UniProtKB/Swiss-Prot annotation:
HAMAP family: UPF0303 (MF_00761). NCBIfam families: PRK02487.1-4, PRK02487.1-5. This is UPF0303 protein BTH_I2506. Gene3D superfamilies: Haem-degrading domain. It holds the Pfam family HbpS-like.
Length: 165
């Protein structure tokens, strides 16, 4: 995996995957899409879609654990703090040889800079929430979210997917 290449790709994903508007119905559709993708692939994951401060969709699939719920919360907190995907933040920390606690004073019990949380951005409004998956390796969590966002927004996933490692 090439960190610099992944960071470039994630920046394009974040710029492209923007909703014209977002509401509870759209959150439910996105969460349901993620659930169907995960079920079809046999993934044991937690799925969380929220605007900041308001949960709109949550699912815990068979085999997922309370640990996945906590990881999803902590990854979502990273999006809320940085307005970037948790994977991008984690890769930046890896590049810097630092942690969120070291560099930003953010407690590990509340923030996880691992892939899987992605900003929900609305044109003209900016980042208003996050969509998070937890239960796969971090790159897989991130890519599952991107795949569902592409489907919801009418983008070809193949054009926005991270390069295969």
């Amino acid at each position: 995996m090439d960190i610099a290449l992944d960071l470039q790709s994630i920046a394009v994903q974040e710029k492209t995957l923007v909703f014209p508007q977002f509401d509870a119905a759209r959150a439910w559709a996105l969460g349901s899409q993620l659930r169907e993708l995960a079920l079809a692939r046999g993934h044991a994951v937690a799925i969380d879609v929220r605007t900041f401060g308001q949960p709109l969709f949550f699912a815990l699939l068979d085999g997922a654990t309370p640990d996945n719920v906590d990881w999803a919360r902590r990854k979502g907190n990273v999006v809320a703090h940085f307005r970037r995907s948790s994977y991008a933040v984690g890769l930046r920390m890896q590049q810097a040889g630092a942690t969120l606690a070291d560099k930003h004073g953010l407690p590990v019990a509340e923030y996880a800079s691992h892939g899987g949380a992605f900003p929900l951005a609305v044109a003209g409004a900016g980042v208003i929430g996050s969509v998070t998956v937890s239960g796969l390796p971090q790159r897989g969590d991130h890519e599952l979210v991107v795949e569902a966002l592409c489907a919801q927004l009418g983008h070809a996933y193949e054009t926005l997917a991270l390069a295969r490692s």
